[in-house]
Amino acid sequence: MNGQGRLAGRVALVAGATRGAGRAIAVQLGTEGATVYVTGRTTRARRSEVDRPETIEETAELVTAAGGTGIAVPTDHLEREQVRALTERVDREQGRLDVLVNDLWGGEHLVDFGKKMWEIGLERGLRMLRLGVESHIVTSHYALPLLIRRPGGLLVEITDGTTETNKDYRESLYYDLTKYAPLRMALGLGTELEEYGCTAVAVTPGFLRSEQMLDHFGVTEANWRDGVAKEPGFAISESPVFVGRAVAALAADPDVARWNGQSLSSGQLSRVYGFTDTDGTRPDAWRYIREVTAGGREADDAEYR
């Protein structure tokens, strides 16, 4: 482990770290020297229903290569005994938990934008809620007793949108509920954790260039701008590293309690903590969506980077 990082000696659990934001968050915590337990359902031996090639073993290796200690633990966070065993293992091996990141989702294949609630299969909609809400609750139930043993613990709920942006309906009822619940969890758990000297926040990336999104646009991280021809709004997208750096900055902030209960965005936090995306810019996707996409303003995307 890198003993020089700002998070050296700290222990993190990133639940849902197989790919996308979760993977990048785990790696950035590792860059700062943390020991990071990474969980997910897709391993080198078995794929989840999402059917993507990325694995949690790869994520753990990336964490270690970045300077931390990555530990992969295959876990289905809807299976309570698996989550209980996970937290007991962290306790047994480390005796502490400093950062819990709930990035559990894996429901992209279930989203039906543009359909009325009653037009969506009930089991399909409820599965989305289980993957994106129940999993967060189960994980918090078992992990927070370990987190609160020491003052300074941090819970990060990863979602899509802030309390401001999610005031508007997100087109699909099940998706709307799934992505609003983590905002309420951060608020409620922030209140409950405060007496233990711990903090809870919700963090959202902007237009995330996840592996799945890059595949959707037929591009790679190296030539992602070619996707702008298909979707102009893709110009304001951000790499997963950006939100990873946001969470790492929060975890290393001795005054992180100032954010307790709040919903935050990667773009907002970049202006506070001074980090950038991999290309040196600071994408502010939510302001772009508000002013350009929804507001009808004509603008150069460079104004929002």
What residue ranges belong to the model's regions?
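Conserved internal alpha-helix within the Rossmann fold of NAD(P)-dependent oxidoreductases
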Residues: G125, S135-S140, L154, E164, ...
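Catalytic loop of short-chain dehydrogenase/reductase
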Residues: G106-L110, W118-L122, I148, G153-E195, ...
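Short-chain dehydrogenase/reductase
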Residues: M1-Q94, W105-W118, E123-R124, D300
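Amphipathic alpha-helical dimer-interface segment in Rossmann-like NAD(P)H-dependent oxidoreductases
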Residues: R92, R127-R149, T163, G190-T191, ...
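Active-site loop of short-chain dehydrogenase/reductase
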Residues: R10, G68-T69, R96-L97, E134, ...
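C-terminal helical subdomain
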Residues: A202, A222-R305
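Conserved Rossmann-fold SDR core element
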Residues: L29, R96, L183, L193-S210, ...
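Rossmann-fold scaffold of SDR-type NAD(P)-dependent oxidoreductases
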Residues: A15, L97-L110, G132, V156-E157, ...
